[in-house]
Every structure is written in C-alpha cells, then in structure tokens.
C-alpha cells in the first residue's frame, strides 16, 4: 500500500463502499471501471463528485473505489460518504464545510419491512364496504 494513501468507508441503504484516495491527476476507478463506464446516469456521477467539487480537490486525487450491494443510487451515496470520510482523514479542517453540505452524516433511511396482512410496507388490501 502507498504511504500517502487515505481511506474511507461509506454506506447508504444496503450498499457499502471502500474508498482509497492518493495524490494524483483526478482519476476515478470504481470496481476496475471508470466513473463514466460504471454509472450511466449523470446524476449518480454528480453525487460521486460532490465532495471533491465542494473542497476544490477535483484534479488533486486519484480515487480507487470498491462498492458492493444495493442499486445505482445507493452505491453513489455510499461512494460519496466514503470519499467524504477519506477527505477528512486527509485534512480534518475540511470537516466543517463537508458537514454543512450534509455529506458527513450517514443517511440512516432504510427500506421499511413488509408487514403481515398488508401488500407492501403500508399498502393495505382494498377495502369493500359490502
């Protein structure tokens, strides 16, 4: 492992991302694929870049990311959380502005479980009066 490498773990919904950042030219590799190849949606790419753009670190780090579980949006959120934690490990003074933007807090919202007697978590079967 490189001596000047910083690490952050990010989680969102059922996704978990491991993020390694080291000084470089702004290369982002996710599961051995480029950011553009991995995320087809522009919104997901934007979410991943948010902490870097906020802290003006876009071309300063190479990112190596492995992410598992969940869907596109959950994985993008997990990566964002991981990048945020890695940046804070690199420079603790960034914590304030990252916290203000809401990137430091782990989004605790999970899928609500399906209940017995209901069709989904809250959707009830149709009610017939007579």
From Swiss-Prot:
Show the Pfam families listed in the entry: Ribosomal_S9
Q: Might you name a Gene Ontology BP term for this protein?
A: translation
Q: Which GO terms describe its cellular component?
A: cytosolic small ribosomal subunit
Domain of life per record: Bacteria
* One Gene Ontology term of the molecular function aspect: structural constituent of ribosome
* Entry keyword set: Ribonucleoprotein, Ribosomal protein
The answer, when asked if Transferase is one of the entry's keywords, is: no
Q: Known PROSITE patterns for this protein? A: RIBOSOMAL_S9
Family, according to the entry, reads as follows:
Belongs to the universal ribosomal protein uS9 family.
Q: Which NCBIfam families match?
A: PRK00132.1
Name of the molecule in the record: Small ribosomal subunit protein uS9
What organism does the UniProt record list as the source?
A: Serratia proteamaculans (strain 568)
The record's gene field reads: rpsI
